[in-house]
Every structure is written in C-alpha cells, then in structure tokens.
Amino acid sequence: MKCPGVWGMLTVTMCVVFLGCPQAQELQGHVSVILLGATGDLAKKYLWQGLFQLFLDEAGKGHSFSFHGAALTAPKQGQELMAKALESLSCPRDMAPSRCAELQAQFLRLSRYRQLKTAEDYQALGRDIEAQVQQEGLREAGRMFYFSVPPFAYADIARNINSSCRPGPGAWLRVVLEKPFGHDHLSAQQLATELGSFFQEEEMYRVDHYLGKQAVAQILPFRDQNRRALDSLWNRHHVERVEIIMKETVDAEGRTSFYEEYGVIRDTLQNHLTEILTLVAMELPANVSCSEAVLRHKLQAFRALRRLQRGSAVVGQYQTYSEQVRRELRKPAGSPSLTPTFAGVLVHVDNLRWEGVPFILMSGKALDERVGYVRVLFKNQAFCAQSEKHWAPAQSRCLPRQIIFYIGHGELGHPAVLVSRNLFRPFLPAQSWREVEDRPGLQLFGRPLSDFYAFSPVKERDAYSILLSHIFHARKESFVPTEHLLASWVFWTPLLESLAREVPRLYPGGADSGRLLDFEFSGSHLSFSLGQPEQLVPGPGSTPRPSDFQVLGAKYRESPLISAWPDELISKLASDIEAAAVQAVRRVGTFHLALSGGSSPIALFQQLASGHYGFPWAHTHLWLVDERCVPLSDPESNFQGLQAHLLQHVRVPYYNIHPMPVNLHQRLCAEEDRGAQAYASEISALVTNCSFDLVLLGMGTDGHTASLFPQSPTGLDGEQLVVLTESPSRPHQRMSLSLPLINRAKKVAVLVMGRTKRDITLLVSRVGREPKKWPISGVLPTSGQLVWYMDYEAFLG
C-alpha cells in the first residue's frame, strides 16, 4: 500500500483525528494560509498560535488546510526559525495531553516554510498551491495572505500576489493587513490607493487587534441584548461621560525607532481607542450580525466626531525617553525628542444622542499600572434622604451608576463586563459569559466588586484567534475598511499637526508621577490639573509656555494689534466679540456679526459656544463674509463649519441665521439666479446703513481676505455689496462681501494665526493701500475700527 505524502495527509488528518472515518463529512474545500513575516515577533507571539486555533476550530468541519510560513530568510535558516516558533503552540486547557500532541503533530505536518523574495518565488508558490489541490483532487475554497511585515513592503508583495497567486474562479482571496496604516491622512490615502490597485475592498482585512479582545467584541452584542434597558439611558440626558483608557507600565525601550515615527497618539488612540469609541457611540443597527449595517453605522459615528483642536489634548513624555532615543538611534547629546509617550484627548460627538457628552481617550507608557477599560459613567440625578451607611448597592440610586467593559489586566486581571447593581441586571449569553464570584477586598473605580453584576468569558481567547476566525468566516465588521481608515485620519491629522512642535510634559514614570498627568476639561478644552514643577525642567526643548506671557498690545499698519499664544488670543477675541455684542444689544437691540470661514475661526467658534454664557445669542444675527459655491451641507462649505462648531451649540433663533444663497434652483452660483443680489437685498433690509456691528476676517498667505483675491478687481470697489469671485484654489467659485461693504462695518477684526502666515504678515506690514495686489491692505473701515489679532507665530515667526 502506498503511503500518502505530506499533502496527502490532509484527508487522512480530517478523517482520523477529528471525525472518525465512518462519520467523515464531505470536504468543503481546501484553504491555503500564507503567513508573510512568519519568523517575526508578532508571528511567534500570536499569529502561529492563532492559526493553530483556526485549524482546531475549522478542520473538523469539512475544510482542509495547508500553512505556508514565508519570509525573506533563506530556506534552511527560515525553516529552523519557523520550527522554533511552532514549538510553543498550545491547546485549550480542557484538551487531553495526548490529543493535544496528536493535533500539534498534524499541524506541523501541514506547515512548511518557503522563501518569498522575488517575483519568481511568488510564481512558484502559486504553481505549488494549484498543483497540490489538483494532485489531491481537492476543491479550492480560498487563500489567505497575512501581511505580518512593515507597510513599506506592502506594495511589492501585493503586486506579486495579484499577478501570480490569485486563486481560480469560485475561490476567495483574503488579504490581512497589520497597522500602521499610514502616518497621517495623506500617507494613509496613498497606501490605500496603492493597495486598491491590486485588491478589491472586500478582499482586504485591516486588523485592529483590539476589536478581537473579548470585552471590546462584546460592546455591540451587549448593547443589542440589553436594548430595552439601555434605550432610555444610552444618551446625553443620562450619560455623564465615557472613558476609554489603555495604560501600560512598560516604556518604549527597544522600540524607539518605531515610537519616534508614530508616538502614542498614532500608536493607540488613532486606531484602538477610536475604534472602541465608535462601538460605544454608533447608532445600533436593527441587526448587529449584519456586517454591512454595522460598518455603515460606524462610519456615521466617525462623521459625527467634532474636529479636534490643539486645546483638545494634553501630552507627556516619561523622563528617560529622550536618553533612550539618543542611545538606540545614536543621536547626538542635546537633541531632545518631542515625541509624546502619554496623551489625553477630549472628544465630542456632534449628534442628538451624544451632544455635550465628553469622551475621554487616554493612553500612555511607563504609567502606574497596566490596564484597559471602557467606562460609561451615568449622571447621578437622585438625592437620598438617609445617610450613606444605609445605602444598599442593589437599591440605592445615590451610589455611582456605571457600565464597564474591562479589557484586561489591572486589579481584576481578566476581561469582564460590569454593570452597577443599582442600574439594571444585564443579560449576557450563558454559553459564553458567566457571572464572577465576589472577591472581598477588591475595589474597582472606588467601589467593591460586590456593587456590580460582573461577568467574565467562560473561555478566554486571545484577540488574534478571534480575528483569524472572523477572517475565515468573512465577518468584516471586526476590521477596518478603507473608508473608515481615512475618516479616522481626517479626524486625527489636524491635531497631530498642531502638536508637532508641542513640548510634552515630563513625568518620572510609574507611581512616582503622582498627580502630574491628571487633567481636567472645560467645554472643549483640556488642560493638566497641576502646573509643571520646576524640578522637571529643563525638558525636551525650551519653548516657553503660553501662560508665561501676557497678551501683547501694539500697532500694525497703524491699527491696534493684539498678539498672544493661540489659546490666549482666541480667548481675547471671543471676549471682545461678546463685549461688542452686549454693547450693540444694549444700544439698538440687535447685534449683526459677519463671520469668515476656513480653519482659523474654528477655535473661536468653539470658544464662543462653550465659554460665553452671557452672549446675547437671542438678539444676534449671523452672516457670512464669504462662501464656497458648494451645497451648504458639503464639508467644504463655510456655513457647514459654522453649523458644526457654533450654531448647533448655541441658541440663535433660526430666523437670525443668514447663509449665503449659493445654491438656487439646483444650481451653484449661477449669475442668472442673482444670489449675490438677493444676499445684498437681505443685508440692506435688516442691517442699518449696511453697517455690520462686527466683521471677522482672515488673511491668506497670498494676502487675500474674504473671497477677494489678488490680481482680481472684483469686489474691490463700486456699489455692489455682494459679489461672485474666482479663487485660484478649488472650489474656484465663491460668493463674498465686497470691500466697500466690509469697510462700512463699525468694527473689523482680522484673525491671523500660524507660522505659515509670517511672510505675508511681514510683507503687508510694509506696503501701502494696494488692494489689487493684496486685498487685505484695502481693509480700513470708513468710520469704524480695525483691530488685528495675531498669534506669536504669525507675528514674530
């Protein structure tokens, strides 16, 4: 009798080990798994074990497998390294040792190493898989390629797979990608475009391993299974705040080359914690088992995230980090790093469910404990007449009410879902979650474990085992689609850019950090609770803190100049606008304010929305200085920015809001629709003498202001109050207040921020009134006041 070869063992393995021949199922097809980077750290620590678990779970259900470990290493050395990695495979605790040994042996026989370095290597792999399937008479179900390699290698590998290793008709291809997925929005978009030229979206599975952690994976099922109890609670009326936390005790030693490029925000907040945030904040689809519906609702949550500003975050760095960087990367002494190893970020979700609820994201290295959790803290709206000693955990409404998805480690030491007993008794499926016995003396978030209904997994599984199973079964909701990835980078990139030169707060690390990293929030602004102690100075760099300076008053182009650090400047401008509003309302009963768009005023809008409760919004009319010729709902629309960052947060009567009519008769800025004339007529009818109480302008790097551009005479003189103009950048068509109308204002404030404005600031300071070259130079109110508001970077460089 001829003995079967290695690949001929496939059917024998399934028959003997899993099913017994009399009960053997018909094969559902053969699956080839190719692990690229098979000898790397991630593969050794998690991926081979995850693939072994996949083999245990699925081979007995009718599938046959082959496992190809691949790397750049030469065959002999690679085989030795892979064999060493496979030595640590383990079976479930409830499996008999003899059975475990048998299964391990079968898995090893089905696993082989091969070098994948050249196009010819990939061609040979494709031929070998096809030959194996044909030789054994198997039906091919699909091929899984796991990229456990650096992203810079993705393109070449993808090209080779696409050209040489695609399966035939009827079989699937699944390509698994590991982070990082870019460094910012642009790089992520470039990588996504490159991969998209080789693979279809449904073929790609971007891994965020936190989505495989059992407590995180339970968030949506928990919300679904407890809909009745949560429907009335999971909203801004009842939730005080949400905390999404990942703390580590280890530092970045040995990984500083990676950390210098990415830092803590890119490493954990942009991906892991943001993915968790969307699971908490998203609207529940009718069917949480439908991947498409889940992903669609998650994307809606991404799009509802309020834009982050510099004041949305605090950053820190453990004290020995810069020295580690110098040592590992061989940098010269006196070259401190500005890379944050700690970050706290305040996020708001701008929709009806979550308006005003703070989501706190925090992660860091060299902290006092290793722990991860999601904590939903509910408002305490009860008053208890009896003293605290009479409060019963299951009955008293005065005790804290919270739901915690405990990711792991910490005092508890394992994944768990905890619900305060005074909230409701939760349902979790008994086959996968069991109630935790009380552990006297254990305190979680200041309360004994007995205060909670606490559940832990019946069987703990590592994240990669869960995710590999989801890949095998094409459960896309556990992965990051391209559209979600880019939405996340759109959200995080502006903050990362604003922090690029920020000096992080130094902290000793561990328990010695004390209260140094405690932070607090007010409105949309986050700040450390304590000042930086002198003994931790000098830090990395010597940039002074904003609090070291007062607001500076001076002259610019013969008009008053106010200069300060950005936070102080915005605060001063907001206060001045409020003072002007109060004065106008007291004098004539209304305040007419014309606002510019762009990125600079966003911080001002947020400041006005969150910190000026005495502002007479009910008597304020809001106008636009200029508008892009796009629908008002378009992200490029100035009105959309005003709506997102100001209007939805304050009580301005809707009839006092005056967007520019750029979209009439289903057309954008058509001359024959006379939108500019209509806006001018509205101004004439409502604004006395067409004189706004205050006009807020900006200044472009080319000297343009409003949508009045250099080398274009449109809107610089004449009788027209509102004009259509052409911008050199897209979208080209604009509507704008004219320069004569702007100069009728009682007060004009020009806000100029950022180092990129330094050159034009210097140039405009030296020229006369030449609006055709530099439209901003034509701003000079006829009988009103002009005030310049510049941050130090724009003014001093």
UniProtKB/Swiss-Prot annotation:
Residue positions binding NADP(+) 2: 375, 623
Modified positions (N6-succinyllysine) in chain numbering = 213
Q: Which organism is it from?
A: Oryctolagus cuniculus (Rabbit)
Provide GO CC annotations from the record.
endoplasmic reticulum lumen
Q: Which residues does UniProt mark as catalytic?
A: 272
Its gene name is H6PD
Its family remark reads: In the N-terminal section; belongs to the glucose-6-phosphate dehydrogenase family. In the C-terminal section; belongs to the glucosamine/galactosamine-6-phosphate isomerase family. 6-phosphogluconolactonase subfamily.
Q: Which reaction does it catalyse?
A: D-glucose 6-phosphate + NAD(+) = 6-phospho-D-glucono-1,5-lactone + NADH + H(+); D-glucose 6-phosphate + NADP(+) = 6-phospho-D-glucono-1,5-lactone + NADPH + H(+); 6-phospho-D-glucono-1,5-lactone + H2O = 6-phospho-D-gluconate + H(+); 2-deoxy-D-glucose 6-phosphate + NAD(+) = 2-deoxy-6-phospho-D-glucono-1,5-lactone + NADH + H(+)
| Name assigned to this protein | GDH/6PGL endoplasmic bifunctional protein
GO molecular function list: 6-phosphogluconolactonase activity; glucose 1-dehydrogenase (NAD+) activity; glucose 1-dehydrogenase (NADP+) activity; glucose-6-phosphate dehydrogenase activity; NADP binding
Q: Map out region (6-phosphogluconolactonase) in residue numbers.
A: 546-797
Cite the binding residues for NADP(+) 1: 37-44, 154, 179
Q: Which Pfam families match?
A: G6PD_C, G6PD_N, Glucosamine_iso
Report the leader peptide range.
Answer: 1-24
